[in-house]
């Protein structure tokens, strides 16, 4: 919502780079599992990537994702480090998305360039890590090797946190995590010593399209449960919630009020398509989200400026149907996945007009 306040409109301020298609795991819930390969192609020239970044006047943040961005030393040296140094020189915030299972020295080597180290942590038990974390892998590693990665992840998170890195662990709300939310939260806070626990509902996208998602009722109960049992001294961030001030549901409003008033709680608007585009460093393809199945590739940096791509996306009927905003609650409405899953027949633009009228923001 900072872009709305500063520029009075949605603005491209965040670029996410897919820097590798390699990963040492094959999580059943991975949003990009279908793209994973055993060998990376050659990346585009970094000068082209720098040029496209230079053309974005309001760039605030950059995300590095994969695959596992820290898996391939070649990718780290040829793509990741150059991007990190570019961001550092320009004063851009950087988030690295990693599973934190790799040797610690790889993370320490880039620590000075990282503002947020983001890890997905959905493991209620070690057995779940061993099964779900490699659920889509055809040839399974030995159990001992899997457990070693789990211990490496815990140790890396704890050590990096102790050394001052901001480590943020994200948990997806789905049928698998629901029974274990308290244990997951305690492990993130006490064992991994993370600075923040992020919570997002799981939506079925591409590779993870067969997931057992939660009903709206179960999801709301899970959020209340987390608010009841959480460590109130640890920052919790809730994102992509399918709960909006403009939906006339009393239970929704009670939950939103609780989220607004509790200590160390933030509710985040979804950045995909509102402030962020994803760029593949190998093909140059640009997508609105890092999972892309709703919209597919919308352009390519070999041909177009990212600011032009973003403006063209905002002019589409799909984007227009989603791009509402409510100043009273600093809410930017749903993304494509949320609308299609929970509110296929809701006109959020009409809701926007009603909310502006009700709260006297014309």
Predicted regions mapped to residue ranges:
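Phosphate-coordinating loops and pocket residues in cytosolic domains that bind phosphorylated ligands
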Residues: 32, 131, 303
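A contiguous, low-structure linker/loop signature
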Residues: 110, 114-116
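Conserved alpha-helical substructure of the radical SAM core
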Residues: 1-96, 101-109
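Flexible mid-to-C-terminal extensions adjoining Fe-S/redox cofactors in radical SAM and related proteins
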Residues: 1-11, 285-362
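Activation segment
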Residues: 27, 73, 104, 128, ...
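Radical SAM enzyme [4Fe-4S]-AdoMet core and its adjacent flexible, acidic
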Residues: 39, 54, 90, 116, ...
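Short cysteine clusters
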Residues: 23, 27-30, 270-274, 289, ...
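Hydrophobic pocket-lining residues within nucleotide cofactor-binding pockets
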Residues: 69, 101-103, 173, 202, ...
